[in-house]
Amino acid sequence: MKYFLDSAKIDEIRYAYKYLKIDGITTNPNHIKNSGKSFNTICKELAAEFKDIYFPISIEIDPHLDKAEDMIREGRKYAAMSSNFVIKIACTEQGLIAAEQLEKEGIKTNITLVFSVSQAIQAARIHSTYVSPFIGWKENNGEDGISYLKEIKDIYEKYDYQTEIIAAAVRNGRQIGKLASYGIHITTAGLAVYQESLNHPFTSYGIQKFCRAWEETKQDD
């Protein structure tokens, strides 16, 4: 399983790339806002940061756009900034039309805001490079946010779809483990989620227990 970082903060990205070995980045308008920088500034920083390596970076176009031709135009604009940029487009009819055209032009796309199996099927049928089904938002709404990703994965394998699944809005290590057991290609989460997934109360308990044993053990002079 690949780990993508869901962030637009360059310091977080550098840290996660160096120490957590992330394989890519996903951004969205909320992350751009939280970075305190403009959209264009973030795009330029990310393009420069990874200019010498292949490193997929999902850049979400203006969500106000609701016509395919406008989405295509903006997708081309940002794809021209870096060969690493993947154009992130919401799963609407017009968005899927735009993504299909961009893929035909060799521009990679990521269909986002996916909440159903049928949406994910169409994303694969138009040959989007990635599809991003959301987990956390569905679970916050009282729905099962995990099992439908297994359905998507099974359907993709059955019909030999090549679109890679990015599990989005991942909230904890339990979800990461379950997604890995399903064979989901990629998970994307914030830095804190990955860091917290490395912790366990028994690990902390064990360290404390062994520290006490160490201190109580007679040491050679």
Regions found by a protein language model. Give the residues of each.
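Glycine-rich phosphate-binding active-site loops on the catalytic face of alpha/beta enzymes
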Residues: 29-33, 113, 129-141, 183-203
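Catalytic cores of alpha/beta
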Residues: 11-19, 70-74, 98, 116-126, ...
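Active-site beta->alpha loop and helix N-cap motifs at the rims of alpha/beta catalytic domains
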Residues: 2-14, 19-22, 27-94, 98-101, ...
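Glycine- and other small-residue-rich loops at beta-strand/loop junctions that grip anionic moieties
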Residues: 5, 59-60, 88-91, 112, ...
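Alpha-helix-loop-beta-strand connector modules within alpha/beta enzyme cores
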Residues: 40-58, 79-80, 96-109, 146-165, ...
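Glycine-enriched alpha-helix->loop->beta-strand junction motifs that scaffold or abut catalytic
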Residues: 19-24, 81-84, 101-110, 125-132, ...
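C-terminal alpha-helical cap/extension of soluble enzyme domains
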Residues: 156-221
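Conserved, mostly hydrophobic/aromatic
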Residues: 28, 87, 123, 179, ...
